[in-house]
Amino acid sequence: MIKFIQCVRRKSGLSVAEFRQHWDAYREKVQILAEVSQAVRFAMSTTLRVEENIRIMMSRGTDEPYDGLVEIWWKKGPDALEILSRPEARAQLEAIRHLQEEFMDLGKSSFFFGAEEVVLDRT
């Protein structure tokens, strides 16, 4: 299984509430792309604003957590890349890029493909 992962930081000056409004609109666009590209799974996460996250960050000296995380899974990488190169997917990717520029700090975010190895799944 291959997946595309986005670790997203909000733009400076954008409140968490404002980020979440953009995030909801972003979900709709990415969901269309996931469907067009025949993804088998699509998930989005937002960081919980809890004290434990601050303790973890302070004890390990890490940066602040990302504001959001997107994960899209496909069965086969080459098939996903071929589908994503099609005109309908390219058009959706362009619309997504414009939306990203509105609310994401792209220089502090990270986007990458990875191979998933499920070690434990009790769902």
Where are these regions (language model features)?
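Macromolecular interaction modules
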Residues: 1-123
